[in-house]
Amino acid sequence: MQRLLDAATALGWGNLSARGAEEHRDTARRLEQRLPGLFDAIAADHRPIAVETSGQARAVASANAFTGALVAGDPALAGLVGAPVTDKDLLYFHKQPQNADYRAYLAGDPDLAAVLASIDAEPRTAEAARHTVTRLFRADFAAGLTGDEQVSFARALYQLYSAAPDLRAEAPGVDLDPFLAPPDAQWFGYLDDAEEFYQKGPGFSGRTITYAMAQVLLDDLFARAEAAAAGTTADGAVLRFTHAEEIEPLAVLLGLPGSTEPAPAADPYAYRNNPWRGERVAPMAANVQWDVFAGPSGRPGEPVGHLVRMLYNERETAFPSTCVPVSVGSHYYELKELERCFGRGPAA
């Protein structure tokens, strides 16, 4: 454990690990493989690739790893990739003054405090903590710890346990699997998921405080797609680098898989009643991608339509069921149809 702590300290808590950088490089390579025509056209037309970040060190390092791999894969892009531009209102909105109500919710909302306290107080928490402590320490030492101390230790251990795979390059050979029994690790993972769900995910039924602030990012996705369709942007592509605090609420607004069900006050979030899982909603290098395509030409004199395809964590993903794709089972949608079903204007 000390080796892992030392590695995390040397890296800097919250900074991008070697594994994280490689995840971004791999994602960039796969993007080029999926859309070779896009990058060929960008290079041929000398169109810029815009790069935007939250300004946080981790996001900037992610951008550099990603764009470095893009250029390595296609040297013709050299000179076309812009330097990272910081946009905190768009990509770090949870910390901005306009969302003070969200931070007040985290700090002191009575419903939030009550539901998390009730989940933490489930008997399984004390049981898992006690089991963890008694497996690792002498009986007399374990008996001298209060229940709260056992829980604090076990949950701190789980944080290290869950971080270890991301630090395998910085702390090679460190394996914390023997320190936590799988059922106990699963329970502590659930406690973390419950906290994320109520702080950044669908949250309480009838309340939008955890995700309404992501509207600015959804609006910008539409604005960029509309500009591409209208031919009013010089950018060949726009790459953004942000955080789970932004991806998770955006996933709710987009109705992405696992992010569609808030929890009624009378039936708190649990694995048995809700599909939301942090490892699926926002894994390392989580991403949302919109591809805009010029559609087939219409009748003479009619404008060419544009289609949008969404990828979520690099998988083609349907928009909400209120949006109608170009054909049954397709992942392509007319841009005008998306504008209609997201309430951005009447369908043409």
Task: Tell where the protein language model's regions lie, with residue ranges.
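Signature for phosphate-centric chemistry
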Residues: 1-50, 54-238, 242-348
